Amino acid sequence: MKKKVLVGMSGGVDSSVAAYLLKEQGYEVIGVTMQIWQDDEEFIEKEGGCCSLSAVADARRVANKIGIPFYVMNFKDAFKRNVIDYFVDEYMEGRTPNPCIACNKFIKFSSFLDKAMAIGIDYVATGHYAIIEKHNDRYIIKKSEDDKKDQTYALYNLTQFQLERTLMPCGQYKKSKIREIAKEIGLRVHNKKDSEEICFIPDNDHGRYIKNRFPNKVREGNFVDKQGNILGTHKGIVYYTIGQRKGLGIAFGKPMYVVDINPFRNEVVLGDLEDLLNTKLIAKDTNYIPFDTLKEPMEVEAKIRYSQTPSKAIITPIEDGRVRVNFHEKQRAITKGQSVVFYKDDLLIGGGIIEK
């Protein structure tokens, strides 16, 4: 009897080819687009985003083309609670969240998987560029064949339970090959542009998004230097992130960067590039893939943002499941709320959320 797999289809080329590859491998494939948009007007406005009307139409067209059933499943309440509300709360607290990591943790590999299992489906699948393998009795995640498209940074939260029930067929291919396969089988999405924006903020203006929803919470405040001297007025702390130089709306005669955000005083602290360089951080909410807990210091390569090349570091377990990370070289703009992710060569070790 064929194993059943529910494929999360965004209307993009990766998830489309993932569905095709799994069907070719002999699975009984069902395509699903997750409804996460919060109202109909928003849905129509997001033309081109991964949760827009055109995205659903693209996914449905692909499903018809490759001969699989297709459904839209409603995840909007879970998405609002676990991704949008978290996103807004983090910015209000002066931190910079990563909504894709939250979505993977709480929606794609939790709510979506739960729904799949509830209806008797064996696996869920996505178009992520990562490789899941079983070594002895443990599932591991390795970097994808395509270094430039590798998405393991956003997958460090996956549990053994989730990995056992998850398929990522695109991880074995380069992006160019995925596009080639899509073209060969006649998918119109073969040359569709990759989505790079936050899916629920297609114009990428997160400050305006939060201000529109919570106008009373976003207040002007002071830009200050490290000594607390007032330098000017900011639009609201949600508009800024650590390391930001452009868009401050004020000229200082020299480059100035956001080096800290104080939500209690509603202040944005500005400083020099040197003030952004650091070798240490502490991360919370950690998860490890090849083992359950980190018991002793470990040499790894670590990165503090998605697009960064990993740097050598030592990770040391501390209280409450936290981890101390000491980099060999100074890192620029270590940002609270973002994730730090650990590797050994191409093996994903784990990660956590930067606390300080």
Swiss-Prot record:
<dbReference type="GO" id="GO:0002143">
    <property type="term" value="P:tRNA wobble position uridine thiolation"/>
</dbReference>
<feature type="site" description="Interaction with tRNA">
    <location>
        <position position="338"/>
    </location>
</feature>
<keyword id="KW-0547">Nucleotide-binding</keyword>
<keyword id="KW-1015">Disulfide bond</keyword>
<feature type="region of interest" description="Interaction with tRNA">
    <location>
        <begin position="305"/>
        <end position="306"/>
    </location>
</feature>
<feature type="disulfide bond" description="Alternate">
    <location>
        <begin position="103"/>
        <end position="199"/>
    </location>
</feature>
<keyword id="KW-0067">ATP-binding</keyword>
<dbReference type="InterPro" id="IPR004506">
    <property type="entry name" value="MnmA-like"/>
</dbReference>
<comment type="similarity">
    <text>Belongs to the MnmA/TRMU family.</text>
</comment>
<feature type="binding site">
    <location>
        <position position="127"/>
    </location>
    <ligand>
        <name>ATP</name>
    </ligand>
</feature>
<dbReference type="GO" id="GO:0000049">
    <property type="term" value="F:tRNA binding"/>
</dbReference>
<dbReference type="GO" id="GO:0005524">
    <property type="term" value="F:ATP binding"/>
</dbReference>
<keyword id="KW-0694">RNA-binding</keyword>
<dbReference type="GO" id="GO:0005737">
    <property type="term" value="C:cytoplasm"/>
</dbReference>
<feature type="active site" description="Nucleophile">
    <location>
        <position position="103"/>
    </location>
</feature>
<feature type="region of interest" description="Interaction with tRNA">
    <location>
        <begin position="149"/>
        <end position="151"/>
    </location>
</feature>
<dbReference type="Pfam" id="PF20259">
    <property type="entry name" value="tRNA_Me_trans_M"/>
</dbReference>
<comment type="function">
    <text>Catalyzes the 2-thiolation of uridine at the wobble position (U34) of tRNA, leading to the formation of s(2)U34.</text>
</comment>
<protein>
    <recommendedName>
        <fullName>tRNA-specific 2-thiouridylase MnmA 1</fullName>
        <ecNumber>2.8.1.13</ecNumber>
    </recommendedName>
</protein>
<keyword id="KW-0820">tRNA-binding</keyword>
<dbReference type="InterPro" id="IPR014729">
    <property type="entry name" value="Rossmann-like_a/b/a_fold"/>
</dbReference>
<dbReference type="InterPro" id="IPR023382">
    <property type="entry name" value="MnmA-like_central_sf"/>
</dbReference>
<feature type="active site" description="Cysteine persulfide intermediate">
    <location>
        <position position="199"/>
    </location>
</feature>
<feature type="site" description="Interaction with tRNA">
    <location>
        <position position="128"/>
    </location>
</feature>
<keyword id="KW-0819">tRNA processing</keyword>
<dbReference type="InterPro" id="IPR046884">
    <property type="entry name" value="MnmA-like_central"/>
</dbReference>
<feature type="binding site">
    <location>
        <position position="34"/>
    </location>
    <ligand>
        <name>ATP</name>
    </ligand>
</feature>
<dbReference type="InterPro" id="IPR046885">
    <property type="entry name" value="MnmA-like_C"/>
</dbReference>
<feature type="binding site">
    <location>
        <begin position="8"/>
        <end position="15"/>
    </location>
    <ligand>
        <name>ATP</name>
    </ligand>
</feature>
<keyword id="KW-0808">Transferase</keyword>
<dbReference type="GO" id="GO:0103016">
    <property type="term" value="F:tRNA-uridine 2-sulfurtransferase activity"/>
</dbReference>
<keyword id="KW-0963">Cytoplasm</keyword>
<dbReference type="Pfam" id="PF20258">
    <property type="entry name" value="tRNA_Me_trans_C"/>
</dbReference>
<dbReference type="Pfam" id="PF03054">
    <property type="entry name" value="tRNA_Me_trans"/>
</dbReference>
